[in-house]
Amino acid sequence: MIYLVISVFLITAFICLYLKKDIFYPAVCVNIIFALVLLGYEITSDIYAFQLNDATLIFLLCNVLTFTLSCLLTESVLDLNIRKVNNAIYSIPSKKVHNVGLLVISFSMIYICMRLSNYQFGTSLLSYMNLIRDADVEDTSRNFSAYMQPIILTTFALFIWSKKFTNTKVSKTFTLLVFIVFIFAIILNTGKQIVFMVIISYAFIVGVNRVKHYVYLITAVGVLFSLYMLFLRGLPGGMAYYLSMYLVSPIIAFQEFYFQQVSNSASSHVFWFFERLMGLLTGGVSMSLHKEFVWVGLPTNVYTAFSDYVYISAELSYLMMVIHGCISGVLWRLSRNYISVKIFYSYFIYTFSFIFYHESFMTNISSWIQITLCIIVFSQFLKAQKIK
């Protein structure tokens, strides 16, 4: 059964890739990712305390195909209405981007230094990061992403786009400064999400078809992935163990603690943004996004995006796939014509690329709103010039 599902995912991905000629097309990403997850499960199946059953595989297949069809239909309908619009390429004046970027970097470094000064460095970088992470879990209002992440992400994307049309010493210096802030942001944020969002955004904006940048991308992914998993985490075990923990275990946990039966420790964060908003208005306390660890042959506290949906009802999962697929298709199509949408979509890709890991489409509504506002504000200062 599992090989049939993998085959369907791969065939669907290749059909969509043939039609759209873009590896970042939503349906292509989702189908390839779930094919890789299931292949990873087959390679490491002896590690788990539970095995994937046919009901779970059928559920995954139906949800992924629902997302795919919603994306294709919505994007195709939109394309019929705007296909006569030229896919104009715009150049953002790099000098203006550098000025805005330096201002953002300056404020970011001041904030980072203030935050880091609140913690006493321990015996290792790992213990230092754990101290910061524990403080953020207890007090989510102190989380770095809540303050600076949307601004830095927007500035980074604008810089990458403007850098496509310039190659100056100023650009190289600015790249170094952005990288330094980025590394400190990882240490302060102690999360993986910002790392992958930046990597995906860079790959989408630059274009993986450019060989030189593709090599840089693969190198960056390899270095960051190895650094995070082997050095910062310091966990025992080989590559199969890490593959299991970060790629496959969420689906196993979803099946055992949500899909087959809802455990006592289960919860849903699909409406977390609205719950937190109501908490701010009424003075209440919102639920933490951190879920409890469970044992599936190894420890994990992520349960795929589907867990947040099926906790309420299985029907909600299909509805969310329709909504998510439609929005993703629209954004992909509009990103071909508008820089602002291209920048937003470069980060929105994360929502469907990591469905197998956790829910970020609904729970990160606040971030999507903040990034949108940042793009709107920056667009008032940065006037793009049509060059083709």
Curated annotation (Swiss-Prot):
Any single biological process term in GO: lipopolysaccharide biosynthetic process
Cellular component GO terms, alphabetical: plasma membrane
Keyword vocabulary terms for this entry: Cell inner membrane, Cell membrane, Membrane, Transmembrane, Transmembrane helix
Membrane topology: Multi-pass membrane protein
Compartment list: Cell inner membrane
Domain of life: Bacteria
UniProt keyword Transmembrane helix, yes or no: yes
Sequence intervals crossing the membrane: 23-43, 57-77, 97-117, 143-163, 180-200, 215-235, 312-332, 338-358, 361-381
NCBIfam families given in the database record: glyco_rpt_poly
Function: May function in vitro as a polymerase that catalyzes the polymerization of the O-antigen repeat units on the periplasmic face of the inner membrane, leading to the formation of the lipid-linked O-antigen molecule. However, E.coli K12 strains do not normally produce the O-antigen in vivo due to mutations in the rfb gene cluster. K12 strains are phenotypically rough, their lipopolysaccharide having a complete core structure, but no O-antigen.
Protein's name according to its UniProt entry: Putative O-antigen polymerase
Species this chain originates from: Escherichia coli (strain K12)
Gene: wbbH
